[in-house]
């Protein structure tokens, strides 16, 4: 190799010394199977005279990242260490971080950190916390995790791209912000939080990871807003959407109350224009702001299947029609109940009505009281004075499934499952919608009513396989960390609209899981045979969460709306779950529910809800985990970043590659193994799950998924208590389906996912 000169960051030119780069590569490859000399040989040909040291670092990182494969998975650690090495140099001008107090002061003065980090904590406390920071954990990320942190989570100037922190400082300052007002054992709580996050035993959502410690104070992952049937309500809902979209939130909108086209307004002097113009208004609100400077917002709109305009509403997202009769930039949730399922089963008719009929009582009883709804619905069918349309249930269900399969993003919500298998008392706090990603099930109320309520939920997740799942003390500890931190967040954050402040009275949390597929593989189990294993795991997790919330209630008091919940009656998930689950997982318990019930009766509970099963697409990269409870597409997923694409391999690939259930192999066995596990999880989970379906047309005659198969899956999920169906995934046969190619989707949002 000819002699070349390199330019240092100081601007000084000096002769290139191969030993310096080999020394860094040897350090980065330590403890891995990667040969640093072999990596250097791959890099050599890219070196040019006059290159900067930054250019060389970029070449090293890219060469290592491009080498990540099933055969050479350790390159993901080498690439990550090289990236972190470069990041340290950029942030601090040297490899060693500056002192913690200097770091916080610098970021506060730059307007990047919340000044309360300095006013609420003394210099002595900050120095003590610094002694607990383990910067070497920056070198334990995979390349995918390191890139996710660098591009998405670490505090930066979005104009210049300057990054202000490294991961361990970020994790500790998030903990400091969340626990700053703890009156007792504050530092202990901060350190426990830091340990759980930095060892990747728990995972945090994008709003907390990117925003908590900064002057921004809106971290609720999921926002659910209910629009009524008046212009004032519609406009107020739209204004609320704009406020929350601008704060990075994903939106669920209940639009089902808006009356149908041609309905009377007032004394009949005006005929209603129908829902489509108003839904377009909501779409404009959703797309009006970028999410914290990232991209346009995202929303899912919910409505009942018996809405008089349903035939026009089901097709809103497809590529047929014209702009005037399509609203393609929102997703839709179609709400079914047991009566609708019964009509389908009997090959009967469904009668469509405008939801304002019967003074709105028909609509509200749909969620509040299923017996009353049946009574009113059947009376309305017989009433000649009420406008209606009859349609064969099978015809309507087939239209629903056709649009769901064609767009992938027409979701289904089973309203009776949602309201019957929940901590909320149905007649007191009915649930009338879900959120953007279908995992949230909490009460809302018309934003223009006297009892207006915007529902908020904050998320986190247990990272399965990163702790001993049968060590109940460990689970209890991780549950305590998450419940306390998320509960504190409710008081720490701001509320852009007053209707959302009831979040502090309900105190809804949604703790989920990620890395379930890797956990199955490590336990030599599959989606087909893990019923009892999943039952025990989720019993343990939910027990830990309930125990943590009771402990917090003893310390700080129960939620103000405690009386709206079954907890207030001394009930537990073992009391209110769908008993059909006993057919697939025997009700055998490993935790002491009797003792927990006594504590519940004695102290109450701090949080109305504690758990939800969300997608974990973003944070799964940081924690090096499989996405939520989904099967991975294949051993390798292809991630896209600003610096190009790169591979991520499944956890423990060197040992477990053949033990995983991969998506399309599992799909050949149908959706029931996957749906069975989700149903068992939901026996325990307070809220809902973003349950997906997967279809490979190649395995069916003529390469087309039969309608009967799709409807059978829906019936199976409903029967066993599943509350929502999320994405409808179809294998396209391109050959890339065995790889998870992840690019940002249009009309998507990271906020209500992890």
UniProtKB/Swiss-Prot annotation:
The active site is at 435 (proton acceptor), 437 (cysteine radical intermediate), 439 (proton acceptor). Its EC number is 1.17.4.1. The keyword Nucleotide-binding applies. Disulfide bonds join 222-457. The record marks 726-727 as: Important for electron transfer. Keywords: Allosteric enzyme, ATP-binding, Deoxyribonucleotide synthesis, Disulfide bond, Nucleotide-binding, Oxidoreductase. GO terms for biological process: deoxyribonucleotide biosynthetic process. The record marks 229, 259 as: Allosteric effector binding. GO terms for cellular component: ribonucleoside-diphosphate reductase complex. The record marks 749, 752 as: Interacts with thioredoxin/glutaredoxin. It is an enzyme of class 1 (oxidoreductase). Coiled coil: none annotated. One of its GO terms (molecular function) is ATP binding. It catalyses: a 2'-deoxyribonucleoside 5'-diphosphate + [thioredoxin]-disulfide + H2O = a ribonucleoside 5'-diphosphate + [thioredoxin]-dithiol. The record marks 222, 457 as: Important for hydrogen atom transfer. Under complex allosteric control mediated by deoxynucleoside triphosphates and ATP binding. The type of nucleotide bound at the specificity site determines substrate preference. It seems probable that ATP makes the enzyme reduce CDP and UDP, dGTP favors ADP reduction and dTTP favors GDP reduction. The keyword Secreted does not apply. InterPro entries: ATP-cone_dom, NrdE_NrdA_C, RNR_lg_C, RNR_lsu_N, RNR_R1-su_N, Rrm1. Substrate binds at residues 206, 221-222, 250, 435-439, 615-619. It holds the Pfam family Ribonuc_red_lgN. Heterodimer of a large and a small subunit. Provides the precursors necessary for DNA synthesis. Catalyzes the biosynthesis of deoxyribonucleotides from the corresponding ribonucleotides. This is Ribonucleoside-diphosphate reductase subunit alpha. It comes from Enterobacteria phage T4. The lineage of its organism: Viruses, Duplodnaviria, Heunggongvirae, Uroviricota, Caudoviricetes.
């Amino acid at each position: 190799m000819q002699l070349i000169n390199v330019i240092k960051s100081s601007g000084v030119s000096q002769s290139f010394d191969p030993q310096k780069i080999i020394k860094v590569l040897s350090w980065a490859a330590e403890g891995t199977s990667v040969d640093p000399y072999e990596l250097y040989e791959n890099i050599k040909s890219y070196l040019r005279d006059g290159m900067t040291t930054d250019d060389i670092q970029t070449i090293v990182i890219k060469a290592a990242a491009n080498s990540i494969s099933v055969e050479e998975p350790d390159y993901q650690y080498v690439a990550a260490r090289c990236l972190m090495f470069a990041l340290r140099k950029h942030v601090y001008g040297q490899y060693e971080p500056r002192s913690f107090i200097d770091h916080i002061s610098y970021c506060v003065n730059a307007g990047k950190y919340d000044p309360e980090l300095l006013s609420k904590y003394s210099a002595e406390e900050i120095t003590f916390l610094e002694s607990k920071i383990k910067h070497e954990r920056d070198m334990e990320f995979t390349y995918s995790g390191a890139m996710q942190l660098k591009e998405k989570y670490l505090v930066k100037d979005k104009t210049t791209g300057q990054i202000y922190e490294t991961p361990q400082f970020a994790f500790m300052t998030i903990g400091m912000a969340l626990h700053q007002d703890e009156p007792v054992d504050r530092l202990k709580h901060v350190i426990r939080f830091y340990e759980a996050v930095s060892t990747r035993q728990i995972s945090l959502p994008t709003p907390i990871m990117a925003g908590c410690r900064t002057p921004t104070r809106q971290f609720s992952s999921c926002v659910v807003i209910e629009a009524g049937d008046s212009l004032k309500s519609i406009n107020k809902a739209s204004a609320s959407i704009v406020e929350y979209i601008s704060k990075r939130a994903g939106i669920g909108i209940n639009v089902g109350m808006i009356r149908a086209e041609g309905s009377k307004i007032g004394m009949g002097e005006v005929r209603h224009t129908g829902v489509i113009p108003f839904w377009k208004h909501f779409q404009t609100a959703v797309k009006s702001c970028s999410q914290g400077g990232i991209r346009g917002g995202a929303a899912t709109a919910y409505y009942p299947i018996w809405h008089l305009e349903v035939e026009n509403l089901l097709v809103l997202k497809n590529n047929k029609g014209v702009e005037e009769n399509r609203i393609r930039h929102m997703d839709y949730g179609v709400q079914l109940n047991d009566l609708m399922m019964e009509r389908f089963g009997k090959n009967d008719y469904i009668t469509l009505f405008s939801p304002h009929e019967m003074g709105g009582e028909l609509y509200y009883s749909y969620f509040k009281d299923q017996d009353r709804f049946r009574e009113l619905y059947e009376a309305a069918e017989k009433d000649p004075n009420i406008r209606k349309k009859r349609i064969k249930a099978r015809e309507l269900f087939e239209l629903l499934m056709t649009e769901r399969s064609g767009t992938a993003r027409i979701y289904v919500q089973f309203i009776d499952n949602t309201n019957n298998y929940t901590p909320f008392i149905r007649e007191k706090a009915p649930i009338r919608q879900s959120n953007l990603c279908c995992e949230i099930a909490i009460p809302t109320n018309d934003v223009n009513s006297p009892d207006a309520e915007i529902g908020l939920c904050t998320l986190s997740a247990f990272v399965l396989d990163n702790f001993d799942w049968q060590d109940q003390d460990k689970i209890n500890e991780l549950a305590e960390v998450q419940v306390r931190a998320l509960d504190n967040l409710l008081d720490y954050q701001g509320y852009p609209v007053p209707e959302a402040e009831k979040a502090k009275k309900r105190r809804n949390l949604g703790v989920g899981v990620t890395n379930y597929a890797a956990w199955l593989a490590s336990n030599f189990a599959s989606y087909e045979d893990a019923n009892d294993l999943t039952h025990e795991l989720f019993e343990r997790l939910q027990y830990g969460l309930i125990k943590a919330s009771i402990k917090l209630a003893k310390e700080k008091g129960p939620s103000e709306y405690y009386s709206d919940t079954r907890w207030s009656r001394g009930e537990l998930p073992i009391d209110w779950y769908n008993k059909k689950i006993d057919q697939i997982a025997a009700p055998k318990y490993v935790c002491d529910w009797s003792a927990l019930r006594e504590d519940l009766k004695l102290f109450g509970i701090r949080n109305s809800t504690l758990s939800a099963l969300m997608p974990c697409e973003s944070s799964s990269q940081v924690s090096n985990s499989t996405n939520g409870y989904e099967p991975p597409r294949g051993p390798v997923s292809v991630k896209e970043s600003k610096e190009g694409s790169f591979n991520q391999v499944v956890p423990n690939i060197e040992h477990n590659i053949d033990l995983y259930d991969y998506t399309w192999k599992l799909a050949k066995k149908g959706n029931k193994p996957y749906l069975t596990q989700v149903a068992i999880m939901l026996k325990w989970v307070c809220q809902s799950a973003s349950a997906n379906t997967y279809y490979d047309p190649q395995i069916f005659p003529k390469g087309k998924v039969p309608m009967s198969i799709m409807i059978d899956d829906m019936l199976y999920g409903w029967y066993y208590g599943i509350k929502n169906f999320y994405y409808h995934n179809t294998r396209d046969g391109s050959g890339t389906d065995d790889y998870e190619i992840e690019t940002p989707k249009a009309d998507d949002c990271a906020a209500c996912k992890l």
